From Swiss-Prot:
Keywords: Cytoplasm, Endonuclease, Hydrolase, Magnesium, Metal-binding, Nuclease
Example of a GO cellular component annotation carried by this entry: ribonuclease H2 complex
Gene3D superfamilies xref list: Ribonuclease H-like superfamily/Ribonuclease H, TATA-Binding Protein
Cofactor names: Mn(2+); Mg(2+)
GO BP term (any one): DNA replication, removal of RNA primer
A molecular function GO annotation: RNA binding
Enzyme class per UniProt: hydrolase
Binding-site list for a divalent metal cation: D82, E83, D186
Protein name as catalogued: Ribonuclease HIII
Catalyses which reaction(s): Endonucleolytic cleavage to 5'-phosphomonoester
Amino acid sequence: MNIVLKLETKERQQLAEKYKSYEQVSKNPYITFFAKVGKTSISVYTSGKVVFQGNEAEKLASDFGHIAQVVPQKQTNLIGTDEVGNGSYFGGLMVTASFVSEENLNFLKEIGVADSKKLTDEKICQIAPKLIDRIPHVALVVEPAKYNEVIASGYNAVSIKVALHNQAIYLLEKQLGHKPENIVIDAFTTEANYKKYVNKEQNHPLTKVTLLTKAEDQFLAVAVSSIISRYLFLENLKKLSKESGFTLPSGAGNLSDKIAAQIIKSQGVDALNQLAKLHFANTQKAIKIAQL
C-alpha cells in the first residue's frame, strides 16, 4: 500500500525524530529522510511530500493526519461509478453513476453482471440495454468535439474525469430523491488529487465518496456503470465510424495512428476534432505519418 501525505516542516521534523532509530541511507538526492519500519518504508522528500509504502503504511501514516479508508460492507443502497473511453484515442468519454437497491440484487446476478473488461462486447450489448431500462442511473456522454473543447479550456485528463464523476453522482442523487448509504468510485487517481479537483466544482453530492481500486470487482453498482459506459462507448465509436467513413479502433495503439493519418490525408487534420481526443500523442504521430 502507498500513502502520500504533504506535511509541514514541523511535522516532518517530528516524524524524523520519532523514527530516527529506523533511519537508513537513501541514494535519492531528493529524499531528506528515509526510514524502514519492519517492511514499511517512509520517504520524506525535499518538496514536503512524505510517502509511506508497505503493509503498515496506513497505520504509520495515521499518526500524521491520514484517515483510514472505510470500505462499504453492503452491495445495496449504494451508488457506483465508472468511466470508459479515457484510454482510447478515438471516441468520446463516458461516465456512468448507477444505484443498486436490494430489490435489484438478484436480477443483476441472474443476468451475469461483472466488470465490463471481463465481458465480450457481444455480451455487453446484450446486458446493457436491460440495465439501462431497469437500474436507476445517470450516464454522461462527452463527444470528442466537446472533450477537446473542455481540455482546451484548462481541464486535463484527470480533472475532466473528476468533474464528470462528480456531476453524474450529483444528478443521480437528485433523481433518487434520497441519500444513498455509500458512493464508490472506481479509483482513477489518488484521493488527494480527486479532492483537489472536485473542490473546484460547483455541485457536490450529499454522501461521502470513497475511491477504491478494482471497485468494479467488489461492487455491483460499479460493475453496472462499467457495462453501461462500455456500451455507450461502443455505440459512439460505431456512430463516429459511420460518419467518418473509417472503422475507428478502440485504444491508442499503432492502428489508431494509421487510421488517423488516413483521415488527415483524405479530410484534413481538422476532421480529427470530431472523432478523437486531440491531446493524445497519437495526433502528432498521425500528422508525421500523413506527411510521409
